[in-house]
């Protein structure tokens, strides 16, 4: 049996029997593929191509819209930054003006307080001076009254007392 198999495969041969080699079946299949496959695959490929082109067009449109929105956002950002810088500079100017106004008011208030203190001091000094003059005059009168009764007569004493009282009323 081994020898019959060995001799059957001895050499290369071509089988020209069309029915045994399935050449007709292959020709029918190839012809069917050639005739019907381009329409079927062509339709599928065309639909796929159209879908891809539509997706690309949609992506390009979205990219354009995104670029437009980005440019608009950049412009708005630049505008907002300019406004923020203007607000910052206005705030600095306002803060400086408030600081200067506050310093001016503080200096004026200090001058007013100093002036008030000086006026109070002058008034107190004047009052003390007046009081000291009165006390000195009173003491002088008392001393004079004690020493004068021996030196002056009654008429001179009355005259002197009247003048002293008049002088005290003037102060």
From Swiss-Prot:
NCBIfam families: PRK07352.1. Keywords: ATP synthesis, CF(0), Hydrogen ion transport, Ion transport, Membrane, Thylakoid, Transmembrane, Transmembrane helix, Transport. The chain crosses the membrane at residues 12-34. InterPro entries: ATP_synth_B-like_membr_sf (IPR028987), ATP_synth_b/b'su_bac/chlpt (IPR002146). GO terms for molecular function: proton-transporting ATP synthase activity, rotational mechanism. It is a single-pass membrane protein. One of its GO terms (cellular component) is proton-transporting ATP synthase complex. This is ATP synthase subunit b. It comes from Prochlorococcus marinus (strain MIT 9211). Coiled coil: none annotated. HAMAP family: ATP_synth_b_bprime (MF_01398). F-type ATPases have 2 components, F(1) - the catalytic core - and F(0) - the membrane proton channel. F(1) has five subunits: alpha(3), beta(3), gamma(1), delta(1), epsilon(1). F(0) has four main subunits: a(1), b(1), b'(1) and c(10-14). The alpha and beta chains form an alternating ring which encloses part of the gamma chain. F(1) is attached to F(0) by a central stalk formed by the gamma and epsilon chains, while a peripheral stalk is formed by the delta, b and b' chains. Belongs to the ATPase B chain family. PANTHER family: ATP SYNTHASE SUBUNIT B, CHLOROPLASTIC. The keyword Membrane applies. F(1)F(0) ATP synthase produces ATP from ADP in the presence of a proton or sodium gradient. F-type ATPases consist of two structural domains, F(1) containing the extramembraneous catalytic core and F(0) containing the membrane proton channel, linked together by a central stalk and a peripheral stalk. During catalysis, ATP synthesis in the catalytic domain of F(1) is coupled via a rotary mechanism of the central stalk subunits to proton translocation. Component of the F(0) channel, it forms part of the peripheral stalk, linking F(1) to F(0). It is found in: Cellular thylakoid membrane.
């Amino acid at each position: 049996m081994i020898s019959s198999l060995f001799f059957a495969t001895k050499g290369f041969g071509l089988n020209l029997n069309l029915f045994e080699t399935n050449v007709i079946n292959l020709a029918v299949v190839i012809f069917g593929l050639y005739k019907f496959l381009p329409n079927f695959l062509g339709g599928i490929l065309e639909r796929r191509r159209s879908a891809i082109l539509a997706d690309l067009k949609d992506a390009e449109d979205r990219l354009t819209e995104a670029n437009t929105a980005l440019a608009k956002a950049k412009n708005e950002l630049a505008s907002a930054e300019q406004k923020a810088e203007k607000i910052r500079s206005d705030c600095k100017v306002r803060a400086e003006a408030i600081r200067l106004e506050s310093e001016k008011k503080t200096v004026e208030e200090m001058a007013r307080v100093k002036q008030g203190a000086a006026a109070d001091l002058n008034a107190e000094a004047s009052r003390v001076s007046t009081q000291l003059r009165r006390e000195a005059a009173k003491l002088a009168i008392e001393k004079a009254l004690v020493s004068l009764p021996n030196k002056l007569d009654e008429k001179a004493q009355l005259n002197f007392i009247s003048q002293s009282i008049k002088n005290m009323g003037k102060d």
